[in-house]
């Protein structure tokens, strides 16, 4: 739990950390900036507690803290905004957990409660999660616990295994064969059910690759969470730089 001191500091800078761009446009518009975009639906994901986390699933899946913000427990569609190009490949710009059909009117940065709030923040600065293996995920903490139990059993059988080479690699390739749209041969997304549980883990390629990425909670006019967004690429800014 965050300290009272941390919470007081957070309240003082909270409004500075909101996203000024309309993230929902990734899922309603056909063009952002000068780039055509498309939406990929990767299926429903179960959030049994509504406490959620985001991380690189190949590096920090067992250790990541959940966000202070929560969503109502339930099962929701997960969608990916894709920027398809010949030159740069099919890049995943934004991932959305669609909690309701309502339109967001503000976007609050997801926080876990241990961020360093003493540093000066610029207008475009944000806190987020690190990616070191080119993939991201967003899931419920119950899914995290289920994975820990499953992986502990696997490690008992073979202590030298790792999550990519001995689990996700083959599953990603199989999913790419079954659903090739906007995927390479090695696979770029997977909606994986944790064995013997009702939990599932959506994983997806992280934009341009490794980096540091924010998660935003979208709130509707009633102040209720209507969606959660993982932002990998600022399309308008990023593709201008590539030109």
Label each region the model flagged.
Residues 1-208, 212-243:
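N-terminal domain-onset segments
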